[in-house]
Amino acid sequence: DFRASEGYGRDWRTAIYRQMGTPELQDYKDGIDYLVANHQADRSRVGIYGGSYGGFMSLMAMFKAPGVFQAGAALRPVTDWRHYNHEYTSNILDTPELGPQVYIDSSPIEHAEHLQGRLLIAHGMIDD
């Protein structure tokens, strides 16, 4: 599990404070390195898939690590934290007024121009 996953203690859970998408992406890249080094994974055939927060991470991976993931699927992802649940987001990123750059750095929409590879985005009206 990447940083911020439940069940590993407070430090692990809060490692993404004011930097959603960055520590987790490093964990994904470390996982790829491990699989290539120890389990004959083919680095040229790595993809990423996820829903909800996993969909957000799929977008961050495709946009902020171009070339690392050849394909991705993001189901019901958050694309801009400024437009998500304030109660949830403000506990992790503060508020857009207090940390506008934090919101920019943590929102996939701000990094979309770096996309390489193939990406499927599927979203309905709500994330349940």
Segments from the language model and where they lie:
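Active-site-proximal cap/loop segments of hydrolase catalytic domains
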Residues: F2-D128
